[in-house]
Amino acid sequence: ELLAKANLTKELALSFPQRNGFFYGLIGTEMHEVEIDGKKYNRSKGWNTYYWGNSNRNPYTWNPKESPYHILDMSWTALLMLRWYDELEKDARLLAYAEDYAMALLGIQYENGFFPGWLDLKTMQPMNHLNASPETSLSVTFLLKLYELTHKEEYKRAAFKAMNAVIHEIIPVGKWEDFETYWSCSRYGSDNLVGKKVLRNNMHKQNNFSMFWTAEALLECYRLTSNKEYLDYGQRTLDELLMTQASWQPPYMYVNVLGGFGVLNADGEWNDSRESLFSELIIQYGKLLDKPEYIERGYAALKASFVMMYCTENPQTKQQWEKVHPFFASEDYGFIMENYGHGGRTNPAGEGMGEFTIYDWGNGAAAEAYNRLLDKFGKIE
């Protein structure tokens, strides 16, 4: 049953239409409002109203049907296709789809090495934001994976050119700006800070996603070249990332947060689901550099990714959930919020616990990380 669902997900991804190699980031349906027992709810009109669209976490529109193509999202999806091809099954369609995208990606790389942030939905031309950002790092990882599988030099050349741009323009000044820095849950500065430092502290508004993508790309560059400069920059970037990991248990946090990750230097979340994504990379650096602290931090991040789950194994968390949602019972086991303290406030009565669950940014992501680490590194204590 699980394999069937996984294969359905693969088929869905492959069904996304490509336009000159580029492709949409989501499928959605038309919605409408219904009233049940006096309360109003948003409900889908059904799959017969489906449309292709893109993430609305962008500077231009909240409407996913009108949102532009996001290079980062496409590179991430294509990278996952390559990992499936490499690690699970040699489905040639995955490689072909990713390579069609890669050729389009090479065609829009700037002379300075960066890739654009977004492409206009109609003209397919680069838009006005994040055209020299560390989002480029994820495309580096994708291109290097494709080079590993095809041995085509053009992918490697483009990847190293992009990586060097990030090394010279982003890392020295901590310009960790990506879509989530300004156009997701914390929009502070989106009107006047993009590309600029805050005068008060001489820092950019920063998001640790960019740090992760860059540390990951630098590790892949090192693996291909054995050039220690890439490893040194990677460790430097990883250390910045680890500054956003909780290394203590504050008394004003009412669930376990040790090992969990925050998000921005201008937002409130703790125990964010990204810790499940980060854990493998941290452990990889730890094993490569023979640094037990990194390995410990990586496994702590993995464990933290399960902390928000409503289940008997998390008695402290379970108690908090039941305070804020008294109707929770055994049929709700497995429910997990993407983070803790999303609104910037917590209290003993359950404030900060949240109200929704996202499978691939919560319980599913945590389970995936556990299984990947189990496969790669063996039994997890």
Q: How would you describe each model-predicted region?
A:
Residues 1-381:
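Glycan-recognition and catalytic cores of secretory/periplasmic carbohydrate-active enzymes
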